Swiss-Prot record:
It comes from Phytophthora sojae (strain P6497). Forms a homodimer via an inverted association manner. Forms a heteroodimer with CRN63. This is Crinkler effector protein 115. The gene is CRN115. GO terms for cellular component: extracellular region; host cell. Secreted effector that, with CRN63, is critical to pathogenesis by modulating host defenses. Suppresses cell death elicited by the P.sojae necrosis-inducing protein or CRN63. CRN115 and CRN63 may share the same molecular host targets that are involved in the cell death signal transduction pathway and that their differential activities are dependent on plant nuclear localization or not.
Amino acid sequence: MVKLFCAIVGVAGSAFPVDIDGGQSVGDLKKAIKAESEDITIPAKDLKLFLAKTEGGAWLPDDDQAALDLEDGKVHEDIQALIDGEKMKATWTIEDVLTANNMTKRKGRAPKSRQIHVLVVVPEGAFGSASETSKMDQLVEKVDKMYEQTVLGKRKYVHSEVTSTQGRQLLNDLDIRVEFVRTVPFDAGEGSSVDPYEWKRVIIENGEEVVLTEEQQRKRYRRYVEHNIGTVLKETQLCVIGVERGTNILTVKVPGREIELAGRTDLLILSDLVAMRPTEVQYLPGVKMLIEVKRDVKASNDFQALSELIALDLLVDDPVMALLTDLEGEWIFFWVAEKINSSARIHKAAINKPGEAFEVIRALLVQPPTAPADTDTTEIKLPYFQSPVKRLKLRKALPPIGEGGDNGGIRESIERYYDIASMLGPDIEMARAVARQVTRSIPTFSYFS
C-alpha cells in the first residue's frame, strides 16, 4: 500500500492523503481522489494527474514556496511547469509510474510524509458551489491586484514569491541591469580549504533517509558560516544571525515609486550589538551582507536574491552585498556597482569553492563602511574578483521618476468594474472580461488573444 499526498491545482486547501496499492492503476487513483474530494463533479476519468517531481528529481517538499502557494490556491511557476509536462497515464500501475521516474524505495525516493506527490488538474467548472465561490474570490482578488497595479500604479513584491517574470518586471520598473562579471585566479590565503556544508539527513521510521529543509537547518548552517569567518567577525565586531520566519525585516517602499518590497532573508552579517540585544536587528546596525540559502540553487532564485539586495540597500546607508548559495558548489555574489547612462548596474559573480567564497566574505567584512565624501562610488579589492570592485548606493543610481504609460482604456475598465462591484457586488463575468482586456494589453500575451 502506498500513501500519496495529492493537491488540486488552483483550488485553495491542504493536500490530502490517498491510500492505494502499488499494483492498482492510475485510473484507480483518479477514482480514489474523486472519492476523497466531494466537490469534484466530473467523472474520475477526466481528471489529469501529474507527479510533483522537482527539477532535482525529488518530491516537492510541503514547505516549498510552490507547495505553500498550492495551499492558497495559487499556481507557482514551478507547478505550472509540471502540469505543462507529461501527465500520468491511466493504464499504468502506480508501481510503473514510480519506477519509471526513479521514485522508489530502492532509489531512496519512496513517497513519505511532508511531501506532495500528485498534482490534480480538474477541468474548469467541475466543482460544486463552494469551489465556485472560492474561484470567484480568487478572480476578484486578481482584479484587485490589477486595479492596484494599473490604476493606482502599485506593485508589491514578496521576496520568497518573486517569480522569474516578476523579477524581470521589478528590474524593468527600476531600470536595473544585471551584469555577470568574471572571476580571476588568486593566491589562496590561509585556511582557504573549506569543506562544503553537509546537509543533515535523518532516519525516519521505515529506515529511509530524509534531508531536512533549509528552515529546519538554519541554526546549523548559521554555525557553519560563523565558524569559517569567526576570526574576522571578532576583529570587526560583527555577528551572523538567522532571520526567523515571520520577521519581515527586509520590507521597504521604493522612494518615489508605488513599489513595495516585503519579506526577509535567511542570514545577515551585521553588528554584534544584535547578539547582545536581539531586538536591535530591526535597525540593521552595521549590516554588511545578506545570505539567501537554497539546498538546490535554481536560475530563478537569482530574482529572490536581487529583490532582497534591493530592499536591504534601500534600508541602510552603506553599500551591501547579497549572497545566494547552496553552501556547497554555488556561491553567487550580487552588489550594486555603478550607473551607466540612465540604468543602474548590479554585478553578479560566481564562485564554486567554499574556501574561496569565505575568503571573499572575509575581505568584504574588513572594508571601510562608506564611500569617500567627494564621490558616490567606492572601489574596493576582493580576492577572485576583477579589480576594482565598484560599489554604489542604489538611491544614487535609480533613474528619475517618469510619466506613466497610456493605460487609459484599461484604467477606465477597471474603475468601471469597481464602481459596479461597489453597488451590486462582484460580477465574475465582468471580472473575467476586465482580466482579458488587461492581458491583451501586455505585448507578450496579445498574440494569443
